[in-house]
């Protein structure tokens, strides 16, 4: 589902999350915040290493008992690295005895390795980590140094070839191994995106500090491309913590390792623990640890050309992305639930209705359905374009001039023929049709999360035929199959406690 897709990771695959921004009066305060977050992350990693993470539970299908969820995604999130390949990427499963003992920091497009564990002394202290972070924060930008991190923004086959070129030098091999085996990447961004980046400002927009929500989402998704912070990343690594110059706090993660809830909720919980801590003591004990190891690269002319190509292609990708945010306040999900309707079902039907009103037809829609009720379960696809949704949308649009125009364009009426539109649906009948659409969509949602969706089964059939050397089954070459799998709308939701 992920590893065979040749597209670039940022925007196309890696999700981003922007949390509430921080306020720091000094650089040291920012370093303390990062050190405390990373200390909590190390604590969390030790819980994972001891296999003692509390098992999450949800209501079972009968609604009376609780059912455990598979926790594999939590345990593998910090043990996976996505390595590019020409014909398909490789998911590297890291050995915990030889990985996760150092953290990579990105600053001014340069990378630094900081050991956080040592066999002879155990874990680094919070105070020592603060001092290491301050050393990195004190480094200066060097515009002459090529931004190697930009290579991870390339299409995967191109990045695989560029990586092969890097591997020709021993020092580069050492650097790539450090990046693969680190616990995570921490991006210290000494810049912010311009306030109007890719979006015209509006007074009614929601703001985080001096930037609107769309701006900070651009920041965590792609960093603004090569002209801003896009090279201060290593997108192949599963987890990036991102701290902006203005206190912007967020994350970016590589999607093949797991789904959003497994990493977003952990990020949120660790951040809340740090926020609840008291201010640190002013006195610090000088550290005698070696300075952070800067990753020095040996770049051939071919690699320099690859970097230039990556900058151009990444900037083109970034410029093609628009982010628009609707902050709806007329009513909340509690109002929807009070009518015994799932908010998820409600939104999916609203999207189908909107598309029908705009274009005169429903649309193939993808929504991920978590299937962690099953061992190693990831997702299946909740679809929303149903006959019941169509009947309700048509009833809602009766007498709508725009809809009549769309239907006229989609019909085969001869020139000069007039279409007569009658209003035949009462409000009561429209409500009945809506109830039927809700029932159908609710069943679709429940079928998927309980393992009765169609997409995973069909995908299994297709791959089984390939592995057996058999022809592709006819269903996969049928025009109808192509239509229902062209998702003009891709939707997802991840609940969290932090607005």
Regions found by a protein language model. Give the residues of each.
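Acyl-CoA-dependent O-acyltransferases
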Residues: 1-240, 244-499
């Amino acid at each position: 589902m992920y590893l065979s897709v040749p597209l670039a990771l940022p925007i196309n695959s890696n999700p981003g999350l922007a949390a509430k921004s921080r306020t720091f009066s000094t650089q040291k305060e920012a370093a303390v915040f990062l050190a405390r977050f990373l200390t909590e992350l190390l604590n969390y990693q030790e819980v994972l290493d001891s296999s003692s993470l509390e098992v999450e539970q949800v209501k079972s299908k009968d609604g009376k008992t609780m059912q455990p969820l598979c926790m594999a995604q939590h345990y593998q999130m910090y043990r996976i690295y996505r390595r590019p390949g020409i014909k398909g990427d490789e998911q590297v499963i890291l050995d915990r005895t030889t990985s996760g003992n150092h953290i990579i920091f990105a600053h001014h497009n340069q990378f630094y390795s900081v050991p956080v564990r040592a066999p002879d002394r155990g874990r680094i202290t919070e105070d020592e980590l603060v001092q290491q972070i301050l050393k990195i924060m004190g480094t200066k930008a060097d515009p002459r140094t090529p931004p190697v991190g930009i290579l991870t923004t390339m299409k995967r086959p191109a990045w695989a070839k560029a990586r092969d070129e890097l591997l020709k030098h021993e020092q580069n091999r050492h650097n790539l191994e450090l990046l693969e085996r680190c616990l995570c990447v921490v991006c210290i961004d000494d810049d912010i995106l311009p306030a109007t980046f890719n979006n015209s400002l509006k007074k009614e927009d929601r703001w985080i500090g001096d930037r609107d929500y769309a701006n900070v989402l651009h920041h965590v998704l792609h960093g603004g491309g090569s002209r801003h912070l896009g090279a201060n990343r290593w997108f192949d690594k599963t987890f990036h913590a991102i701290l902006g110059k203005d206190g912007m706090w967020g994350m970016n993660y590589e999607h093949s390792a797991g789904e959003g809830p497994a990493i977003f909720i952990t990020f949120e919980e660790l951040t809340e623990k740090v926020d609840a801590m008291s201010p640190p003591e002013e006195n610090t004990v000088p550290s005698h640890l070696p300075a952070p190891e800067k990753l020095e690269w040996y770049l051939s002319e071919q690699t320099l050309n690859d970097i230039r190509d990556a900058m151009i292609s990444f900037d083109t990708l970034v410029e093609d992305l628009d982010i628009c945010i609707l902050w709806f306040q007329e009513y909340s999900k509690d109002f929807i639930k009070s009518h015994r309707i799932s908010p998820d079902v409600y939104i999916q039907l609203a999207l189908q209705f909107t598309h029908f009103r705009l274009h005169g037809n429903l649309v193939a829609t993808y929504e991920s359905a978590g299937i962690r009720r099953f061992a190693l379960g990831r997702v299946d696809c909740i679809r929303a374009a149903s006959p019941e949704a169509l009947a309700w949308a048509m009833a809602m649009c009766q007498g709508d001039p725009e809809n009549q125009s769309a239907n006229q364009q989609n019909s085969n009426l001869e020139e000069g023929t007039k279409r007569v539109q009658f209003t035949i649906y009462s409000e009561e009948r429209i409500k009945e049709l809506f109830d039927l659409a809700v029932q159908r969509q609710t069943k679709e949602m429940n079928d998927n999360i309980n393992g009765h969706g169609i997409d995973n089964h069909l995908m299994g059939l297709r791959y089984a035929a390939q592995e057996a050397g058999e022809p592709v089954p006819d269903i996969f070459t049928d025009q109808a199959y192509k239509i229902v799998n062209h998702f003009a709308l891709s939707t997802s939701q991840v609940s969290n406690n932090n607005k």
